[in-house]
């Protein structure tokens, strides 16, 4: 029951993932981080079986670091997405990973952020917005209506609010906590989005 979605703004990209780890109808933990920082300016959000996500994510992270040490430079976001897609394709008919990915990054040379959508069948596409799991099911229509090029951070925060509210409206047992991660020229930044705390704060504000 993963909720993962993301989009690009004005020289930054946002990736949101829920924090719940579930097995059938049991919640094992509510502080799971479903994103992995590949380097200082790239992150990858994954949905699928946890074993596949952890193993594949750490494999990509380690090999990108090895490339950096050997060659003295980091992969661009496009190159990182191509490498990740190639690894999914090579393993598809040998030992496939059931991993769906959103890969976001910022490239200083181009002075822009980008987002790549990949699925477990090794398709890869550069997108302005996308999602996996219930994030993909319920948020794409909101992206069609509210996403716009060069979004400001205030507009991006408002769009994140809309997407999470839609997920909570549609799902009977919707996650209450999300990691909101932004990647820009200064690196990656993480914020915990707690729906219960936000509702309590809204009630306090209305009471005043």
Spans of features found by a protein language model:
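Long, low-complexity N-terminal extensions
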Residues: 1-208
């Amino acid at each position: 029951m993963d909720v993962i979605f993301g989009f690009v703004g004005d020289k930054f990209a946002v990736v949101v993932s829920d924090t719940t780890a579930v097995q059938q109808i049991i919640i094992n933990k509510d502080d799971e981080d479903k994103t992995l920082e590949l380097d200082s300016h790239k992150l990858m959000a994954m949905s699928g079986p946890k074993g596949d996500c952890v193993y594949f994510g750490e494999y990509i992270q380690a090999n990108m670091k090895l490339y950096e040490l050997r060659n003295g430079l980091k992969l661009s976001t496009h190159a990182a997405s191509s490498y990740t897609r190639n690894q999914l394709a090579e393993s598809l008919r040998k030992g496939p990973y059931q991993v769906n990915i959103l890969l976001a990054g910022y490239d200083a040379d181009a002075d822009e952020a980008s987002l790549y959508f990949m699925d477990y069948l090794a398709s890869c596409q550069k997108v302005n917005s996308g999602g996996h799991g219930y994030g993909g099911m319920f948020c794409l229509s909101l992206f069609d209506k509210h996403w716009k090029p060069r979004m400001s951070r205030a507009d991006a925060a408002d769009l994140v609010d809309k997407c999470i509210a839609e997920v909570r409206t549609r799902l009977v047992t919707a996650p209450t906590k999300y990691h909101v991660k932004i990647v820009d020229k200064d690196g990656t930044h993480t914020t915990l989005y707690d729906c219960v705390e936000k509702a309590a704060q809204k009630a306090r504000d209305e009471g005043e």
